[in-house]
Amino acid sequence: MRLFILILSAILLLFQYDLWFGKNGYLDYKETAEEIAMHKAENTKLSQRNQVVAAEIRDLKDGVEAIQERARLQYELVKPNETFYRIAKENKDNR
C-alpha cells in the first residue's frame, strides 16, 4: 500500500511539474498573455495613427484649403497679389 501511495504521489508531482513548467503550462500562458496585451496596445496606437492619416488623405482629396495650407507652410507659396511677411523672433543674445 505504501508503494502505491508513493507511485501516485510521484505521478501527481510529475503532472504538477508539467502543468506549471511544461510546454503550454502556466508560465507559457502568462508570457503569451503579456505579449497579447503588448500587441493590443501597439495595435491601438497604430489604429489611431491610421485614422489620422486617413483623415488627412480624405482632406487632401476633397479640400482645396488643405492643399493651399500645405503649399503655404512647406513651400512658402503665395497667391497672386498677395504679400508674404516673415516675422522672425528676436534673440535675447543679440540685445
From Swiss-Prot:
Any GO BP annotation: FtsZ-dependent cytokinesis
Family: Belongs to the FtsB family.
Oligomeric form and interacting partners: Part of a complex composed of FtsB, FtsL and FtsQ.
The protein's role, per its UniProt record: Essential cell division protein. May link together the upstream cell division proteins, which are predominantly cytoplasmic, with the downstream cell division proteins, which are predominantly periplasmic.
Principal place of residence: membrane
GO cellular component assignments: cell division site; cell septum; plasma membrane
UniProt xrefs under Pfam families: DivIC
Membrane topology listed for this record: Single-pass type II membrane protein
Xref: InterPro entries: Cell_div_FtsB, FtsL/DivIC
Subcellular location: Cell inner membrane
Stretches in topological domain Periplasmic: 22-95
UniProt-recorded name of the protein: Cell division protein FtsB
Annotated TM spans: 4-21
Source species, domain of life: Bacteria
Keywords (A to Z) from UniProt: Cell cycle, Cell division, Cell inner membrane, Cell membrane, Coiled coil, Membrane, Transmembrane, Transmembrane helix
